[in-house]
């Protein structure tokens, strides 16, 4: 049922604060773990194996804690992504049961590291009742993440895990170390898988960052760190082999229909180019005469009526071409027609015009 002290906005703000605080702690603890590995290598070089084993247990604890923080960060991000379900539904959604119960279970164990985690747990208990919170803290409800419970447990790490940490640290820092033969012989067969899950992840073996903040080893595999394997050269096609599609193995039936085989394309060669170009009667010696305009060469031929009037010319020799005689241009004006005046001076009488003009002036 809906709790009276639940405040959705306060839960949203503290979820974001928890995510930011967890990221900072993961980065800090990872850097400290890397420095501690160098200290353990110095212990091994000095022959202080027991001191090195104790320091390795501290590193394993820190690596477990970093992985647990990553799980809690994931669950907080999930609650923010589905925050609408928390606000709208009075009952707990089945897809959020593991996230909510795990955060409530981890709050009293990590509140010294992340104080905002306790506020988140209190808001979730106010939302889904205090009785539900009690069941989550004791894991009587059975939905708390098992891996997180293993990472935050108070049990000592297995001896085989400690030995493998020492082996990897000695290998990375080039320090001679002889592992305990009794511990290596008594290692159960199932521990190897747990070791790979804890520290030796697939990402670390490939040279990439491990899932944990500092739990994995970055031992180079397949070459020194930073080198990239060269790809195999691609086979080049032969120049003398003609192209053809690969033939199928044989006819097969698809939905009861027989399928035939594909035939390769025949080798098609281009036709041979003749040694001398062919001659054309209509364009022979077209460039012999430079006086012929391009319009006469390229343009369409004359009409039959016009071509009949043109003088004949030799077909093969343009040098003997003679233009037809044209009439000369007249240099005198044509004669006046009958009944018309011969000159412009005879048509106009200026004396008569002046006399008439004077008479008009007198009348006015």
Curated annotation (Swiss-Prot):
Keyword rRNA-binding among record annotations: no
A UniProt-annotated Pfam family: Ist1
Disulfide bonds: none
Gene Ontology CC terms: centrosome; cytoplasmic vesicle; midbody; nuclear envelope
GO biological process: cell division; protein transport
Residues that bear Phosphoserine: 4
Keywords, alphabetical: Cell cycle, Cell division, Cytoplasm, Cytoplasmic vesicle, Cytoskeleton, Nucleus, Phosphoprotein
Major localization class: cytoplasm
Bias type Low complexity, positions: 335-345
Chain residue ranges for the region called Disordered: 294-352
Subcellular location: Cytoplasmic vesicle; Cytoplasm, Cytoskeleton, Microtubule organizing center, Centrosome; Midbody; Nucleus envelope
Residue(s) carrying Phosphotyrosine: 43
Family from the record: Belongs to the IST1 family.
Function: ESCRT-III-like protein involved in cytokinesis, nuclear envelope reassembly and endosomal tubulation. Is required for efficient abscission during cytokinesis. Involved in recruiting VPS4A and/or VPS4B to the midbody of dividing cells. During late anaphase, involved in nuclear envelope reassembly and mitotic spindle disassembly together with the ESCRT-III complex: IST1 acts by mediating the recruitment of SPAST to the nuclear membrane, leading to microtubule severing. Recruited to the reforming nuclear envelope (NE) during anaphase by LEMD2.
PANTHER family tied to this protein: IST1 FAMILY MEMBER (PTHR12161), IST1 HOMOLOG (PTHR12161:SF56)
The protein's assembly and partners: Interacts with CHMP1A, CHMP1B, VPS4A and VTA1. Interacts with SPAST, STAMBP, and USP8. May interact with VPS37B. May associate with the ESCRT-I complex. Interacts with MITD1, in competition with VSP4. Interacts with SPART (via MIT domain); leading to the recruitment of SPART to midbodies. Interacts with SPAST.
Name of the protein described by the UniProt record: IST1 homolog
Organism encoding this protein: Pongo abelii
Lineage: Eukaryota, Metazoa, Chordata, Craniata, Vertebrata
Encoding gene per record: IST1
